[in-house]
Amino acid sequence: VAYELKGQNEYGFKIIGSYDPQLTLVIDPALSTLSAATYLGGTGNDRGFCLALDNSGHVYVAGYTLSSTADFPTTDGAYDRTYHGGYDLFVSRFSSDLKTLEASTYFGGAGTDYLYSMALDSAGYVYLAGATSSNDFPIISGAFQAVYQGGEYDGFVAKLSGDLSTLLASTFLGGSGTDQPASLILDSSFN
């Protein structure tokens, strides 16, 4: 990609070569200073899929992992510190300078769990959307859809506390086919 001036106070990018549109494109206009960076993961395949900042500057990263309980970093007080098998989801919170892992949890069941979207509201709650093949996926009592409906995957939507210690809401979302919600957007009422 190349940077281009499209008009007064209007900028854009033009594609100058082949690219994979499934990959995230990150562009740093300065390209001279790396402010902060860190690693997160264990010995298995770890895929960070979502990144978000809260109002205090904490950095949330979420994705899915094949790394076991023995080596993926979780924190005391986390909602779930146990790897359940297949790909499990993870959600982690770093300090704004990425020097401290403040909270980190697994989230998922014994099957394969994929995370596709994460959002934060102004109160600091963490919302997740993705797909699961886990019949034992963590669903709260009284959920909209408490039972896995079948197919290769059912979608799910979940809400965690900002400190990643408490599952506040979760539900399956799907029918008898394969259901994979691709994104999650909160409205002005955080619904």
What are these regions (language model features)?
Residues 31-46, 100-112, 166-177:
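Short loop/turn motifs that cap or connect beta-strands within the blades
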Residues 45-47, 87, 112-114, 153, ...:
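Beta-rich catalytic cores
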Residues 36-37, 51, 61-63, 77, ...:
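Hydrophobic strand positions within the blades of repeat-based beta-sheet folds
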Residues 63-90, 130-156:
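Acidic/polar, solvent-exposed loop segments in beta-strand-rich repeat domains
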Residues 53-57, 120-124, 186-190:
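Residue-level detector of Asp-centered blade-edge/turn motifs that repeat once per structural unit
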